[in-house]
Structure formats: C-alpha cells, structure tokens
C-alpha cells in the first residue's frame, strides 16, 4: 500500500509516537489492526493504535505540531542497558540555565542558525518556524530536552540540544540565544548532538 508517514526522521533517530496512514480495502476493524500487524513486524517496531481517517488525510501534512525529546545521560559513567538511546555528557549540566535559554527559542523565528548544511528548506529560504514549547527537565542523571513546533529544519533539534548543552556547561550564556538566531549563522550555535539521543515523541492533529 501507499504509506504516508508523519515525519522524515534521520537515520539513528527513534520514535515513541510515529503516525502513518494507508488505504486498506479490508473488513478487519481498525481496533484489531495493532494485534494483526504486530505479528508480522520486527520486535523493535510496534503498532499501538489504529483509527479510520478521511480519504484525503495525510499523516505529515495534516500534523499541527510535532514534539521531539532529546535524552542526555549526564554522568561520567555510561548506562549499559540504555546506551543506544541517549547521548552522554560527563560534565554536570546546569539545567536552570538551560531552561532559561530554552525559553529564548520559543516563538516564531528564523532558525537558519540551527540548520545543518544541505537543507532544501534553507536553499529555498524557508527557515522560519514557530516553537510553541521548549523545556529542560532533570530526572536523576538523565536530562530531557523537549521541543514542540509546527515544523523543523534539518538537524534543528539536535543543534538546539547541542546549544543548550553549551549553556548548561557554562560555555555559553542564555542571553546569547537571540543573537545566535539573529545572526543566521550555523557556526554561532552549538554542536549537532548524535542522532541516537533523539526521539519523535508525539504528533498532534487538529
């Protein structure tokens, strides 16, 4: 079938709530689709729910906002059971400063400074996005960065997370964020963190 996914995630990125749609000419009720499909899927992919949607629905273009989660293991020692699902930062991060910086990203801005080279959107000058929520939370040795926006540029969340880590490590001040965005210069922002710590958390529809 013609499968329409909600997002084009980079290799190595995980998903907690990926949405897709396809046309199914079947009498099987939607409620039974998860059990039926899961019998044929690899163990690291699971269908959690299925719903009937209008014929013209598109999982990507109908999305109102998408929320991403970036996981950081803030410890000098790795957690062997979770190593594939976070990026380790050994130096203690100041999450209060990171939260102050995170709030500076909220709003409608030109995010070219948080866009990796090779972006088709950047090539067409389409770099304005609206972040509706951005926050940082510590849970023991884990630091979670959560971002909700109406759209994202290439590697935008990974660069945003890298920039917040620079703030948390004391190498950058929260007050620098507006200037970084205004500069439209990728070199002013922080590093691109590895894909393995990034999760598509949820997709919201009207």
State where each predicted segment sits.
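Structured-RNA-binding interfaces characteristic of tRNA pseudouridine synthases
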Residues: 1-206
């Amino acid at each position: 079938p013609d499968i329409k996914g909600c997002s084009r995630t980079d290799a190595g990125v995980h998903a907690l709530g990926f949405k897709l749609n396809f046309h199914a000419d079947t009498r099987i009720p939607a409620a039974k689709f998860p059990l039926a499909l899961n019998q044929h899927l690899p163990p690291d992919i699971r269908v959690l729910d299925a719903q009937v949607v209008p014929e013209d629905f598109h999982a990507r273009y109908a999305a109102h906002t998408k929320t991403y989660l970036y996981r950081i293991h803030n410890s000098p020692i790795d957690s062997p059971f979770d190593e594939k699902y976070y990026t380790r930062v050994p130096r203690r991060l100041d999450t209060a400063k990171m939260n102050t910086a995170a709030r500076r990203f909220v709003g409608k801005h030109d995010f070219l400074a948080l866009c990796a080279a090779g972006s088709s959107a950047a090539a067409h000058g389409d770099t304005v996005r609206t972040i509706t929520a951005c926050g940082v939370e510590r849970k023991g040795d884990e630091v979670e960065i959560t971002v909700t926006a109406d759209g994202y540029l290439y590697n935008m969340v990974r660069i945003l997370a890298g920039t917040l880590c620079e703030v948390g490590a004391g190498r950058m001040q929260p007050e620098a964020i507006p200037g970084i965005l205004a500069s439209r210069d990728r070199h002013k922002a922080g590093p691109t963190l590895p894909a393995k710590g990034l999760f598509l958390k949820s997709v919201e529809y009207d």
